[in-house]
Amino acid sequence: MTSSRPVAVIILAAGEGKRMRSTRPKVLHHIAGRSLLHHVLSAAGALAAARTAVVVGHGREQVAAMLAEQAPEVVPVVQDRQHGTGHAVRVALAALGELAPGDTVVVLPGDTPLLTSATLTALVAQHHARAAAATVLSAVIDDATGYGRVVRDGDGAVRAIVEHRDADAATATIREINTGVYAFAAGPLQTALARLTRDNAQGEEYLTDVVGLLVAAGQPVAARVVDDPGEAGGVNDRVQLAAAGRVLRDRIVEAAMRAGTTVVDPRTTWIDADVTLEPDTTIAPNTFLHGRTHVARGAVIGPECTLTDTTVGAGATVLRTTAERAEIGAGAVVGPYSHLRPGTRLGREGKIGSFVETKSADLGNQTKVPHLAYVGDAVVGERSNIGCTTVFVNYDGVAKHRTVIGSDVRIGSDTMLVAPVTVGDGAYTGAGSVIREDVPPGALAVREGRQRIIEGWVSRRRPGSPAARAAAAAGVQAPGSVGDPEHPDEMPQPSAAEAAVPIPAHQGDVAHRSELPHTGEGEAGIAGIPGAGSRT
């Protein structure tokens, strides 16, 4: 906003908010990814105030900490004793320093998250245009019970603000209410504040009394009726908190759609206030976008995604995924059922597939982790493939250690990479290997476990079982019993403990797996290495 008159903003946030029934100050409760106070500060930002003060009282340390982190330019002002809104403004003015009589002071409640920048800008513009000593933001509602009424004279000028408990029968019929939002000229405001008394039932200094004092002094007082009365609604309990959250959600989703985002089902889509969406993005149902998440053009998110402070590149697809503080490259594919923990970076056209968890993992362009894997504290180069059920073993019980995987590497299925360890460019690991030592570039690392075949074991040790019947149907003839002199190499008879173990109704077949790599590429085999391929 451009104005020839400097603007100062005072936000009243000292109340306890007892109806919230919370140890957290009311103004720090969140909707749409921001605290109530943060929403008010954001709306007031359009005024380009030279100085902004927030009056704090209950939970002052928590509120001051929030301001230091999110709005360090704002001055927190402590109201030690709750002597009313007039007293709070007087304390804030003293902290803001000297103001010229013609400067504008805007006063806002800290619990009105639905106020918009447009409304505040219009309020101040009217205040300046009419050269008013005070301009009240009012609202016209059907049921004004409990609200202070704005009383006007025959010319429409404001004569007074009358609290509900003090209203006579005629005043009680007025539907125009005071929202608690004001624009004042600094000089008349300071003069009126000095004349406030606490001669009332509450023993407090009311800011509403300033209006009456200004009128009595012959100063012009105006009112601007807000276009949407809902904007001025305060949040006093958790029911109202949820209601305000619904309004903000609808606003944000509608704005996103009008800016070029397809939201398939607005009713099941939640987008925080600080999320940014480029045009031609698609948000599928049951998706939650939190924090400072950014989604680039052409990306598809959802269904059933929760992304927090996550960046998604152009044309990426993210399905049924949870991600926190992660980066997903352009054209990448993530999900379903993936969990990208903080520090995950997936490069361009990469893949993180089903039931994969990553943490502090930098995965290069076109690198793939298709399914059932844990990748933590790792750097992986480009075009590498991490086979199914691979685990980056990063924790020794005391400290975390890093694994480094080069480019064009094939990690076989069920590999355990025990950090710290490095696998060089173009290297392979065999399926089922435990890699504890560095693997040179282009090498194959295999941890052998010799396979032993005992012919006829099922027929002798599991007679009558489905497996034995299947073996017989396949033409397998059982050799003699264990201990038969013709079969001295057979296993010995079971011990008493072994014999006591019940024989299961069905035993799965023993897979004859190659000890050479399963790369996860989905190929039938790699030239010269039979059985080296595996599913992806």
From Swiss-Prot:
How is the cofactor bound, in the record's words? Binds 1 Mg(2+) ion per subunit.
Subcellular location per UniProt equals: Cytoplasm
InterPro entries in alphabetical order: Bifunctional_GlmU, GlmU-like, GlmU_C_LbH, Hexapep, NTP_transferase_dom, Nucleotide-diphossugar_trans, Trimer_LpxA-like_sf
User: What GO biological process terms does the UniProt entry carry, in alphabetical order?
Assistant: cell morphogenesis; cell wall organization; lipid A biosynthetic process; peptidoglycan biosynthetic process; regulation of cell shape; UDP-N-acetylglucosamine biosynthetic process
Originating organism: Frankia casuarinae (strain DSM 45818 / CECT 9043 / HFP020203 / CcI3)
Example GO molecular function term?
UDP-N-acetylglucosamine diphosphorylase activity
Where is Mg(2+) bound in this sequence? D111, N236
Q: What is the lineage of its organism?
A: Bacteria, Bacillati, Actinomycetota, Actinomycetes, Frankiales
What ranges does the record give for the region Pyrophosphorylase, renumbered to this chain?
1-238
Sequence intervals crossing the membrane? none
Pfam families, from UniProt?
Hexapep, NTP_transferase
**Name under which the protein is recorded:** Bifunctional protein GlmU
Compositional bias per record (Low complexity), positions renumbered to this chain: 464-483
CDD domains per the UniProt record, alphabetical: GT2_GlmU_N_bac (cd02540), LbH_GlmU_C (cd03353)
What does the similarity note say? In the N-terminal section; belongs to the N-acetylglucosamine-1-phosphate uridyltransferase family.
**Residue segments, region Disordered:** 461-536
